[in-house]
């Protein structure tokens, strides 16, 4: 305790003590692996059969190989296509449901129940979800049997042998898994809007569509930016669903191979140097997008002030 301006200022050491477990966990599981990954990215270190090659310092050679390789650009394109296919229907569905559930004038009943149901898919493990869809859309699965019974197709459609249907299933699964979380976020933002604005618009004769596009959407901008950026970061880390659904092959013709699946293949083949370089690149992209969130949010706060 020390005196400042005639007043006693007391410092509570227990606050710092309670931070120790968090700091230890962060250093052991976050900081040390990050530094190790960056270090390994500058070395040639892989297994050739049963022979260990390296570690040999190669500088930026691993990064050069990644950027000059045609594979990484194809996998980056696959990742972005899958994210766009998932995010567009997800954001539209979430905005629609959020507007419905937050609109007091509709007087909807059972909103708590439906909010719970909407969020439930978010609690299901991706592996379970993938196995469910794999069973449903298998050659002899229920979906093919139903389509043949109603005469829509004459023979089983191989969903996982066509680029469009494989990507569509991956996007559909991710959309179903995450739209509940997005809906809750947008709904919270809508409920935080001053109701007097809606009342004034109603008195002025504005329609529901005009209110949504002129009042709700502009005031939701900070949350929408957050949702877009976090969804993009999650899209860059897409792994479990396509990995399980395609058995790690990314087929057909590697059209569903994502960057993280490519990273996993490098790690599985014990190519630690290239894996480290790819991890660093993904980390930089994620960091840039995270900074963009705070910058855009900060600009919005300044405008309000």
Task: Identify what each model region corresponds to.
Residues 1-2:
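N-terminal Lys/Arg-rich, disordered targeting/topogenic segments
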Residues 8-305:
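A structural signal for multi-pass alpha-helical bundles of membrane permease subunits
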């Amino acid at each position: 305790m020390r005196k400042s301006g005639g007043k006693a200022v007391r410092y509570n050491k227990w606050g710092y003590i309670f931070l120790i477990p968090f700091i230890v966990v962060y250093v052991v599981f976050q900081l040390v692996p990050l530094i190790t990954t960056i270090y390994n990215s500058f070395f040639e270190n892989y297994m050739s059969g049963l022979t260990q090659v390296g570690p040999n310092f190669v500088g930026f050679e691993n990064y050069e190989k990644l950027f000059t390789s045609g594979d990484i650009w194809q996998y980056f394109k696959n990742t972005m296509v899958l994210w766009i296919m998932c995010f567009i229907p997800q954001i539209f569905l979430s905005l629609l449901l959020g507007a419905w559930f937050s609109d007091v004038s509709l007087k909807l009943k059972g909103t708590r129940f439906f909010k719970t149901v909407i969020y439930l898919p978010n609690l299901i493990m991706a592996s379970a979800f993938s196995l469910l869809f794999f069973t449903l859309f298998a050659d002899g699965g229920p979906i093919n049997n139903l389509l043949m019974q109603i005469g829509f197709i004459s023979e089983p459609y191989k969903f996982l042998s066509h680029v469009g249907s494989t990507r569509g299933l991956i996007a559909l699964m991710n959309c179903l898994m995450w739209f509940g979380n997005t809906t809750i976020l947008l709904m919270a933002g809508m409920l935080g809007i001053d109701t007097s604005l809606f009342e004034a618009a109603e008195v002025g004769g504005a329609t529901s569509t005009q209110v949504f596009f002129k009042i709700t959407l502009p005031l939701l901008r900070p949350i929408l930016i957050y949702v877009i950026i976090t969804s993009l970061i999650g899209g860059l880390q897409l792994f479990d669903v396509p990995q399980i659904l395609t058995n790690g092959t990314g087929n057909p013709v590697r059209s569903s191979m994502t960057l993280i699946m490519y990273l996993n293949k490098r790690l599985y083949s014990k190519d630690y140097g290239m894996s480290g370089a790819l991890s660093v690149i993904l980390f930089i992209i994620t960091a840039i997008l995270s900074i963009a969130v705070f910058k855009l949010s900060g600009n919005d706060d300044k405008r309000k002030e």
